[in-house]
Each structure stands twice: as C-alpha cells, then as structure tokens.
Amino acid sequence: MKASQFFISTLKEAPAEAALASHKLMIRAGLIKANASGLYTWMPMGLRVLRKVENVVREEMARAGSVELLMPVVQPAELWQESGRWEFYGKELLRLKDRHDRDFCMGPTCEEVIADIVRKEINSYKQLPKNFYHIQTKFRDEVRPRFGVMRAREFVMKDAYSFHADYASLQTTYDAMYDAYCRIFTRLGLAFRPVAADTGSIGGTGSHEFQVLAESGEDVIAYSDTSDYAANIELAPTLPLKGERTAAQAELTKVHTPNVKTIESLVEFLNIPVEQTLKSIVVESENEGEIVLLLLRGDHEFNDIKAEKLAGVKSPLTMASSAAIVEQFGANGGSLGPVGFKGKVYADFATEKGADWVIGANEDGYHYTGFNFGRDAAEPEFVDLRNVVEGDESPDGQGRLKLARGIEVGHVFQLRDKYTQAMNVSFLDNNGKSQIMEMGCYGIGITRVVAAAIEQNNDEKGIIWTKAMAPFEVVIVPMNYKKSDAVREAADKIYAELLAAGADVLLDDRDERAGVLLNDSELLGIPHRIVIGDRALKEGNVEYAERRNNEAQAVAIGEIVARVTASLNG
C-alpha cells in the first residue's frame, strides 16, 4: 500500500483528557477518532490492527472447534426478562423501544440470544456438544467512559458459547478454549497470565481471566513466587494463621478520641501501629431488620466479593444504613465495635491470633484499647474477609504471594445451568429423558487487546507493535520521493520485490519533510523500516532498522529484500 492511496493522520500532541499511554498514542497515531464520550471511529490504520487481532482469534477458534455465526446487536427484552438479567444488569444495559412500543436492548453480551437459538435448534444428545462464536460490536452504557478504547461504551468482542450433555463434556471444551486463549495471546506477542477469577454479573461456577501485565492495569493479580498459582485479587483466598493466639497483656480501657472517625486519624491520635487496630464494617443481613458486623485489621483492604458469600449476609452486599447502625450500636460509624453487640460477627483470619486490639467503643468519640476476643466479646466466626497482600502464604501452600497489575483481555466461564435452566434449554438423552444442557462462555475484548498491547509496547517515540498486530510489517521511507529519480526508482523496486515476497508493506510516498516521515514511522510503530536517501544510494546502501531496538544500519541495496524477508520469516 502506498501512503498516497491510504490515509495517515497523525498528531504531535495528545488531547489533555488522555491519561493512559495507549489512549494518547492511539489518538496521536490516528488509529481512532473520538465521536462522543466512549465512542470512537476506527480509522484505516487502526482498523488494520483490529483485523490482525480478529484473524488470529478466528484461526484459533477454528482450531478449537468453534463455529462462527453472527447474532444481533439489538436484542428483544423478553429474552433478558426470561433469564432474569433485564433488571439485574442495571443502567449499563441500554434499553430502547421500537415504533411498535416493544422493548429491546443493545446487547453487552449474547447469552440469552444463543440460548434461545440452541433450544430451538438442538433437541438430542446426538447433536451435542456444540461450540459457537461471533465477533461483534457491543454496547455498555458506562457511567464514566475513560482510558480511550480500554473502557469505552462501544467495543468489539469475540463471544463464544458451548453447550453440552454433561459436565465432563463442558470441562473438556473449557480446557480446549483455555488453551486456545493461551495460544491467541502468545501469538499476539503479549505478556499475560491466566488467573482464577470471580464470575461477576455473567454468573456460573469456574472462571479464569486472561490478564495482560501492565502497570496501568485496573486489576490486581496475585501470584505465587514458587508455583503456577495466580488469581485475581478479588478471588485469591487468605489462609488461617498458624500457631497460638498472643496472650492478652492489657486491660480493656475506654479512651476519649474526639473527632476520630478513620483508621488513619486513630493511628495518629493514639500514636499506635495501624496493625494494632480493628475496623468495623456493618452490612445488612439476609434476615430483614438484622445487621452483620465484619471486623478486619485496620491496614487490610476489605473484599466485598468474599463478604457477600458469607452465610447470613444479604446478596448483593448492602451496607447498613446510618439509622440502622445507630439503632443497633448507639453510635455512628467510626466508633463501632463488637463489645455489647448481640448480632452475628465475622472477623478476618488475620485477627484470630492477635491481642490487645484498638477498636470502636460504640460511643461517639470513644475507642477501646486492650480489646481481646473471648474476654471482652464473644469469639466471632473467623473467615476470609480481605484482599491478600504481598508476602501472604500462597493458597496452594507453595511459596509467597506477589502482586502485579493487569488488564483483563479475556475471560472464560463455566456457566453450568445458570442460563439453560432459566430458559429451559434442554435435550433428550440416550434414554429419551429430558435434561438441561451444560453451558460455557468465552470472551475476548478485541478492541481492548489493541490498547493493552500498546500499554506493554511503547517508548517515548511511539508504539512498538508486535509482529502479529502491526498494521504493516515494513515501512519504506524515501527521502525526496517526488524530486529524486534515484530514490523513487529504488523505493519502487524494493516495494515491488517485498510485495512479491508476500510482505505487508507501506511505501510512505507523501510529499512531507524527512523529519515528519521519520517521526511518523516511529509513532506508528511498524516493526521494520527502510530509509532510502540519495547519499546512501551513492554508496549502494539503504538504512535499515527494527522499531523495537531502533538501531539503524547500512545494508546493501541488493541485499535488503532478503534481509527483511528473513527477519519476517524468522
């Protein structure tokens, strides 16, 4: 492709609102153009990258036995009402009516649609298992779209759905799709980790995320420094502490702590280690009118996903109202504790072996020092309530945990019968008996993969594309293409020979200054660059550089095509 026939639109500066490197570089390189908050046009250069990702995904889906179809973006409300997600999904689900006043939505996922298709088309165990996928534009009405295409309202997803006669079959396909995802992200040249994860709003049982490692990632993953264990921090469990409880040394003492309502201010006011404090979180019970008290160390981060799964706790997790707290404790938040509380109390594992805690006294402006479980309040039930921290024992018992940030680009779920039961997706088994199908679902954020790749692969000059994702494999940058016959003839000859060799080549024949052409080639991140100028040609050479190391070297003009094709095929 010649640049004069293509479309290149680059910027020297990124817009002020762009925070992430990927957002800045995608705008500057002209990969995307913003139309509204969270809505983007994929320009020709960006679309080439998107298609490269899609091609790899399609190849690996076919290898895994998944069959492509295409489902609608606009979906009928009755399917979502049947599954129970019409109300559950909340305002992120964009609802609309047609001219006949019928309810529809812009689908963020397609579980309901594919379940409806399968229940109409498949009725026998002889037709199972089946695995379908599509690549489609989605819409999720994000309350605060940000970070460019990383968290946009409109995005491209690959969704796959599998249906099975039994769980063993589901597990086989789940493993095959897990392996396919590993191949996809490896082929795309990404540094990633598969991690155990929560199922979230999709539901089901088993689940793994595929996280691209990046400091800008919104997710935190925990992994063992010894074994293969890895999980999203939301799911990574903490373990009960070993050994005996520390003996109590202090008496329970009420101290005046005026205007002290946070752990930080408590630590400063009493001049104590934060590890000696307990914080109280009060949530609604599944029994109406009752509340549950949750206790964890002041320096630990509360994990609401774990708390929601506790017996007796209302789901979804709901914080108790101020009125309910005052009614039950006689004090406001910031001064709460278990002394005298008659309701259910859970305490985190990390508090079980400690002694002489500092905790709220259930009186505004007062705290207790020297609090001990069993002596000053009944022993609570000790459970896992917090996020893991670096240095915690790995849940598999091998090594210690480390933390890293990641960008979720893929997610696989064992849905089991969450949707098939609700929507009566059944089949006749070999005995002629009706059975509910097992179901799996498998997603990849195609547009997010592009942004995540840039987060991992960039420098001060621009993007550094991996081999599989680059919009072009080679860029030829001729100096004075319009004015120098020698440069033009050499550029056209090399361009033609590379095309004949099967390379994906961009010949930048724009009538621009040399500095603009060179800067754009680095900003666009095309892996291989050939610079052709009159001075080098007089010596029989061209300049060749790989974008990842930017080390330019002179190569004989008669050898450059073989040199580049060898690198491309290596």
From Swiss-Prot:
GO terms of molecular function = aminoacyl-tRNA deacylase activity; ATP binding; proline-tRNA ligase activity
Give UniProt keywords alphabetically: Aminoacyl-tRNA synthetase, ATP-binding, Cytoplasm, Ligase, Nucleotide-binding, Protein biosynthesis
Reactions mediated catalytically = tRNA(Pro) + L-proline + ATP = L-prolyl-tRNA(Pro) + AMP + diphosphate
- What are the GO cellular component annotations? cytosol
Q: Where in the cell is it found?
A: Cytoplasm
Is-annotated flag, keyword Aminoacyl-tRNA synthetase?
Answer: yes
The keyword GTP-binding is assigned to this record = no
Q: What is its EC number?
A: 6.1.1.15
Q: Which SUPFAM superfamilies match?
A: Class II aaRS ABD-related, Class II aaRS and biotin synthetases, YbaK/ProRS associated domain
Its predominant location is cytoplasm
Biological processes, Gene Ontology terms? prolyl-tRNA aminoacylation
Question: Which chain positions lie within coiled-coil regions?
Answer: none
Q: Which family does it belong to?
A: Belongs to the class-II aminoacyl-tRNA synthetase family. ProS type 1 subfamily.
Outline the subunit composition.
Homodimer.
NCBIfam families the record matches: PRK09194.1, proS_fam_II
Physiological role: Catalyzes the attachment of proline to tRNA(Pro) in a two-step reaction: proline is first activated by ATP to form Pro-AMP and then transferred to the acceptor end of tRNA(Pro). As ProRS can inadvertently accommodate and process non-cognate amino acids such as alanine and cysteine, to avoid such errors it has two additional distinct editing activities against alanine. One activity is designated as 'pretransfer' editing and involves the tRNA(Pro)-independent hydrolysis of activated Ala-AMP.
Comment text on domains: Consists of three domains: the N-terminal catalytic domain, the editing domain and the C-terminal anticodon-binding domain.
Any idea what this protein is called? Proline--tRNA ligase
Q: What's the source species for this entry?
A: Neisseria meningitidis serogroup C / serotype 2a (strain ATCC 700532 / DSM 15464 / FAM18)
